């Protein structure tokens, strides 16, 4: 936390609402807090695509109905599903004490790429979070 931030500023209703949304709304959180490496090696905010938003809505619907999410995703390559799942897991474990996540792939190289993505989320995320 920056030393020039006062307690009054931290308790400002607008700031508190933003923090609440960052904690509770992944669609709000992702483009503001998660940085990804694009196909052309640029670092940019995670702007969810159509497939990612669809997967998110299906997961949230199941969570609303059952209280949890269990999905098996049979996916084509390069749709962003692994990025979405990595971001969702990162959001969950960093905002809810005691939660863990684990992603395993069929290849060590791919598992390492997903770990690097999560590491990037952590290193490049806003300090305030």
Describe each PLM feature range.
Residues 2-129:
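Phosphate/NTP-binding elements of NTP-utilizing enzymes
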């Amino acid at each position: 936390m920056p030393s020039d931030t006062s307690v009054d500023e931290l308790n400002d209703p607008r700031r508190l609402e933003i923090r609440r949304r960052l904690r509770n709304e992944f669609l709000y959180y992702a483009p503001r807090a998660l940085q990804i490496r694009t196909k052309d090696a640029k670092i940019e905010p995670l702007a969810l695509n159509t497939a990612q938003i669809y997967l998110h809505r299906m997961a949230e619907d199941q969570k609303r109905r059952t209280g949890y999410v269990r999905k098996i995703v049979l996916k084509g390559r390069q749709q962003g599903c692994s990025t979405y799942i990595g971001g969702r897991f990162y959001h969950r474990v960093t905002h809810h004490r005691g939660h863990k996540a684990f992603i395993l792939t069929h290849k060590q190289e791919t598992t390492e790429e997903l770990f690097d993505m999560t590491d990037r989320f952590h290193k490049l995320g806003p300090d305030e979070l």
